[in-house]
Swiss-Prot record:
It comes from Rhizobium leguminosarum bv. viciae. GO terms for biological process: protein maturation. It catalyses: C-terminal L-cysteinyl-[HypE protein] + carbamoyl phosphate + ATP + H2O = C-terminal S-carboxamide-L-cysteinyl-[HypE protein] + AMP + phosphate + diphosphate + H(+). Residues 15-99 form the Acylphosphatase-like domain. Pathway: Protein modification; [NiFe] hydrogenase maturation. Involved in the maturation of [NiFe] hydrogenases. Along with HypE, it catalyzes the synthesis of the CN ligands of the active site iron of [NiFe]-hydrogenases. HypF functions as a carbamoyl transferase using carbamoylphosphate as a substrate and transferring the carboxamido moiety in an ATP-dependent reaction to the thiolate of the C-terminal cysteine of HypE yielding a protein-S-carboxamide. SUPFAM superfamilies: Acylphosphatase/BLUF domain-like, YrdC/RibB. A zinc finger (C4-type) spans 116-141, 166-191. Coiled coil: none annotated. The keyword Endoplasmic reticulum does not apply. This is Carbamoyltransferase HypF.
Length: 759
């Protein structure tokens, strides 16, 4: 028998249908399948439809095709599943890309991706028609989520629909060997979007100390020279005295290394297609001290859009011995959502920026830059937005579709579909009308691109939250989920934990089931059941929300709780507010209380003299963390009894030092917190027969505390889980709400079915 005859006997012609689900539209999947099928001499077709990508292939090597798809998929593709069905061979010699089919969407689009190496080379190649073109893209990079109105992901459903392709781009689009084969946003200077100002003019204005508002992928940035104190000071002044840390954009990883000391994990994040802002250790003297006052870490990001590359290239030519660096902060005047519309920018940014640079490609839905850091050796979100949305979180099981409206601070929303949870981009504080409008836009857009009609709504317990009003306005059955339960449930969903899980919910404030302010809780979750199993020793909360803005108030309150309010005048001599507050505590007027770890941080920072008044949320705790050298535990610095963890001995120790060195106080405070929380969790876990400990809440953004606590728990034989797929702060609440609500809904449904059966 000849080898060719043997091969024909062993490998008969087969026809297979592949249903590919996941982030497989808008990432070059169809041209990839086309080229792969041609290389394997297979006939058939590929198309996008409402369920993902459908492929039919026929030939002698058809059985090898599914594995090749799985292992060789395009870099931006995320394959969730490949279902294979064998069909009767139909013949044919060609493999074709067919038009997309409509219908209900059960797939998703990819996130926006940073400029790839190929497009980056074309930007600087005088022989390329994309030379110097600020909107170059291909199947491996460019905007996706922020330009898409609906699925399937085709040009007609994006903001590129208003830019008909020129003859050359159209030829690239239909050429299977071209990197822009079926790249929906493909465009060139002859047919695509245009920038309102030349790159050289923008660069010259920045070099001259100007503030520039630049429209990018998900909205406008406010830019200025990161080494110019005058420009940065003016930017802060024009942003109504905003003192929050600014992010810095640089051209490449070499520039990042000049300004900071990123470790391997941080560099991997910096160069990833998502291009988030990454918090890294700053090098002294390389940047203006006005960028991140009082902090030792700086938020860096690499250029991710062609316009960024062109601008930083031009600036670098002017300073060849010094890497160009730009402050790049969100254009969100007055704390309102990010500006993304040209007309809106003309109204709202002219008082801040000396130059407003626009382009004519509409941003369908705005998205801030994502912000990340590395905690305990792995990435963690501070803000999840551009580059990651709308990638889902796998909940591990099917369930009803739930929409969650999140918290009132750092608001996000979440929609579940099947076994997936889709957390929205960062919306922000719901304390203004523009934010409420943005939240409605996000809800409508996310439900549209997912083609989902939620069956239930989940929201916070707080009776005055605007996010609760949003849920009530959806006219759906509502499942309320307590704030700290949601923090822990988010980590449970994130790490796919099951069975009883002991959670530590550590944050600034959340409305408790008893009507008091919680924020330092042990929460035990077992599917649809939960219990508050412990809390920090409550402290007085004088003047309510003012205590969160003025840490000195919490300092006085902590001394009152420790029985040494007499130390207050010594720590803050001549402070009239301290005198008044001390007198108030001496009276009979009742004061609300809080078990919040965030407020305990404020108290300690004030007692240590780090900060008495905050310019932004979390400032005192962030500056206190920045002082830590080596955490150490104070012997006898805490006690545990009846599920309550009491740090009053630690507070008393700090106060009795008079005014200790800030670094000494930070070391002792963080070290004692870590030891106390670890012991507290270990006792609680042992009492409930579990080793799983979920660590949630905004305090878990403190790298020293989170990493130290995770390490201490592992040393005690426990299995800690930190937030990874959603922020630890209130930006992750919207993931925990539907994750827990679905457990409640499915349990109630099961109970109803059981009762019907028994009847």
């Amino acid at each position: 028998m000849t080898p060719s005859l043997a091969r024909q006997i062993e490998s008969p012609v087969r026809r297979l249908r592949l249903r590919v689900r996941g982030a497989v539209q808008g990432v070059g999947f169809r041209p990839f399948a086309y080229r792969l099928a041609r290389a394997m001499r297979l006939s058939g077709f590929v198309l996008n439809d409402s369920a993902g990508v459908l492929i039919e292939i026929e030939g002698r090597d058809a059985n090898h095709f599914p594995e090749a798809v799985r292992t060789q998929a395009p870099p931006l593709a995320r394959i969730d599943s490949i279902d294979v069905l064998e069909l009767v061979p139909a013949g044919g010699e060609r493999f074709e890309i067919l038009e997309s089919l409509g219908g209900r969407s059960a797939t998703r689009i990819g996130a926006d991706a940073a400029t790839c190496d190929g497009c980056r080379r074309e930007l600087t190649d005088p022989a390329s028609r994309f030379f110097g073109y600020p909107f170059v893209n291909c199947t491996h990079c460019g905007p996706r989520f922020t330009i898409t109105r609906a699925l399937p992901y085709d040009r007609a459903h994006t903001s590129m629909a208003s830019f008909p392709m020129c003859r050359t781009c159209a030829a690239d689009y239909v050429d299977p060997e071209n990197r822009r084969f079926h790249a929906e946003p493909v465009a060139c200077p002859n047919c695509g979007p245009r920038l309102s100002h030349p790159i050289k003019e923008i660069s010259a204005r920045l070099e001259g100390g100007a503030i520039v508002a630049l429209k990018g992928v998900g909205g406008f940035h406010l830019l200025c020279d990161a080494r110019n104190d005058g420009a940065i000071g003016l930017l802060r002044l024009r942003k109504a005295g905003d003192q929050k840390p600014f992010a810095v954009m640089v051209r490449d990883i070499e520039a990042a290394r000049q300004l900071a000391r990123p470790n391997e994990a941080e560099e991997a994040l910096l160069i990833s297609p998502a291009r988030p802002i990454v918090l890294v250790a700053a090098r002294a003297g390389e940047l203006s001290g006005l960028i991140a006052p009082g902090l030792t870490r700086v938020g860096l990001m690499l250029a991710y859009a062609p316009v960024h590359h062109l601008l930083l290239d031009e600036l670098s030519r002017s300073s060849p011995h010094c890497h160009a660096a730009l402050v790049a902060t969100s254009a969100n005047p007055g704390g309102e959502p990010l500006v993304a519309d040209n007309d809106d920018a003309g109204r709202r940014l002219v008082a801040i920026a000396d130059l407003v640079v626009t382009h004519d490609r509409d941003i369908v839905v705005r998205a801030d830059d994502s912000v990340m850091q590395v905690i305990d050796g792995a990435p963690a979100f501070i803000r999840r937005a551009r580059g990651f949305v709308p990638e889902p979180v796998d909940l591990g099981a099917d369930g009803p579709s739930v929409i969650a409206t999140g918290a009132d601070l750092k608001n996000t929303i979440c929609v579940t579909r099947g076994r997936e949870a889709f957390l929205s981009q960062h919306i922000g504080g719901l304390d203004n009308a523009e934010a409420i409008r943005f939240q409605r836009e996000v809800i409508a857009h996310l439900c549209s691109i997912l083609d989902v009609k939620p069956e239930f709504a989940a929201c916070d317990l707080h009776p005055d939250f605007r996010s609760v009003r949003t849920a009530e306005g959806l006219n759906l059955p509502i499942v309320p989920v307590q704030h700290h339960l949601a923090h822990v449930a988010a980590v449970v969903a994130d790490d796919r934990l099951s069975g009883p899980v002991l959670g530590l919910a550590l944050d600034g404030h959340g409305f408790g089931t008893d009507g008091t302010s919680w924020g330092g809780e042990i929460v035990v979750i077992d599917h649809h059941r939960w219990q508050r199993a412990g809390s920090l020793m409550p402290l007085p909360l004088p003047s309510g929300d003012r205590a969160a803005r003025e840490p000195w108030r919490m300092g006085v309150a902590a001394l009152q709780a420790a029985g040494r309010i007499d130390l207050a005048p010594q720590l803050w001599p001549g402070h009239s507010g301290v005198t008044q507050l001390t007198a108030m505590f001496s009276g009979s007027m009742p004061t609300p209380v809080t078990s919040s770890l965030g407020r305990l941080f404020d108290a300690a920072a004030a007692i240590a003299g780090v900060r008495l008044v905050q310019d932004y949320e979390g400032q005192a705790a962030m500056e206190f963390e920045a002082l830590v050298r080596a955490p150490r535990c104070l012997a006898g610095g805490y006690s545990i009894g009846d599920g309550t963890l009491d740090f009053r001995p630690l507070i008393l120790h700090l106060a009795e030092q008079g005014r200790p060195c800030g670094a000494d106080a930070a070391d002792v405070f963080h070290g004692t917190l870590i030891a106390g929380l670890a012991d507290w969790a270990a006792r609680g876990a042992a009492a409930r027969g579990t080793r799983q400990v979920a660590l949630g809440g905004g305090c878990m953004m403190n790298r020293v505390l989170a990493a130290g606590l995770a390490r201490a728990l592992r040393e005690r034989g426990l299995e800690p889980s930190l937030p990874r797929l959603a922020p630890a702060n209130d930006g992750g609440i919207a993931l925990g709400q539907p994750a827990y609500a679905r457990q409640v809904i499915m349990n109630e449904h099961a109970s109803i079915e059981e009762n019907r059966t028994c009847a």
